[in-house]
């Protein structure tokens, strides 16, 4: 094992030298003296050298490709962190392709039989040995079940965990060294990024997780004209094997075929936006790997086109609070209400509470005003979020993994939509959806539902408060004093409930203000009830 680690280290060193990645480190102006002096000990730096023909981003991309699948996938993850990376490097890393030679089909057959506990011929009436596709984590074979259904069988690449563990160890080592060596590197939080990648890559190795994600997404879009998700055959799914319905559609980037079948491209682009916002705001569960290779278009109704989504290994979700703040942020942003945007970032806890609103507002205005000089159809929604996050990072915004996934997905959807229909006005498509969603959240039905959910917790709240007070009570508290202390606990619980109602009413009223609409009667009812519970004796 140690010999393999040494060989891997030498391999990494050769790639660093070949693409002169040492320049990326030594161009940093704030290196410690001892590290800056190391360049003198690198023999290749004393040799004559030609001017570098490739940019730093291109050299980094080629180096990651040379280092293999694990580094390629890490580069793909890095490309989504546009809030942290320089634009030229992020653009280059977007070009990384996760394509590797297929592994021996006999290994795939052996793994399937081991996982299913049956021979391939006993499960499938046909199994294509030649894979349909091969990537760093798994490869896919076509097959037919004994019952006649056409399926695809996804199989995890054998012997992958030791390779991943070894490469992750080197990535962590490089990240820690970079953090110690450079102030700029520390700002990028490389150790945190590698940690996120570690979780993502190990999640992708568990195909039962992917099957569960696909099953959830399919249920969310059951009967929808917007998107179709293939059926999962749960009785044939295992941690290293996934069996799904085989779909036949047109790759979303095959513009010629889409045109030949007279696909309504405008509707297709707009439905892509609707799919995104439906997942994020209605379901709070979104496919977070919607690059063109994972999206197809049904051939059934080209005049009413439907998307087909595959590969649900990476998904994201938002809390109700994040959904609410995100919707308000976007609406306020397009109203150019920068103070509201700044205040929402602080209220949500995305930036520290001590942040000066005026300074944050000015920074947002400086970054965002130039964007609005363009026509709305030319404004990139994803770029807006990216610039917003970049600005917030300067004010110590904590990394929000769910928002990073959201921004990456939005950039993919937006880029795809404009490729399908260049005049796509994403904001005009999204605004009615957001405003409708906000109105539904303030509707009497939604408010009553929230109150009902809170009411279920009331008995427990009083008991918890009373228990807390009793634990904090004096050791000499006698039995005669306990009833009074219990009464005080009940009163405190009611005051807490009142505070919650006040907060809920204020949130509803604020939502009405965001939409320039009158506050609904439930908001006033909640405010009045909350005030009564707080001031009552």
Swiss-Prot record:
One of its GO terms (molecular function) is protein kinase activity. It is a multi-pass membrane protein. ATP binds at residues 132-140, 154. Residues 126-494 form the Protein kinase domain. It is found in: Cell inner membrane. Pfam families: ABC1 (PF03109). GO terms for cellular component: plasma membrane. Its EC number is 2.7.-.-. Keywords: ATP-binding, Cell inner membrane, Cell membrane, Kinase, Membrane, Nucleotide-binding, Transferase, Transmembrane, Transmembrane helix, Ubiquinone biosynthesis. The active site is at residue 289. It is an enzyme of class 2 (transferase). InterPro entries: ABC1_dom (IPR004147), Kinase-like_dom_sf (IPR011009), UbiB (IPR010232), UbiB_bact (IPR045308), UbiB_kinase (IPR050154). Pathway: Cofactor biosynthesis; ubiquinone biosynthesis [regulation]. GO terms for biological process: regulation of ubiquinone biosynthetic process; ubiquinone biosynthetic process. The chain crosses the membrane at residues 24-44, 493-513, 515-535. The keyword Membrane applies. Belongs to the ABC1 family. UbiB subfamily. PANTHER family: CHAPERONE-ACTIVITY OF BC1 COMPLEX CABC1 -RELATED, PROTEIN ACTIVITY OF BC1 COMPLEX KINASE 7, CHLOROPLASTIC. Is probably a protein kinase regulator of UbiI activity which is involved in aerobic coenzyme Q (ubiquinone) biosynthesis. NCBIfam families: PRK04750.1, UbiB. This is Probable protein kinase UbiB. It comes from Pseudomonas entomophila (strain L48). The lineage of its organism: Bacteria, Pseudomonadati, Pseudomonadota, Gammaproteobacteria, Pseudomonadales.
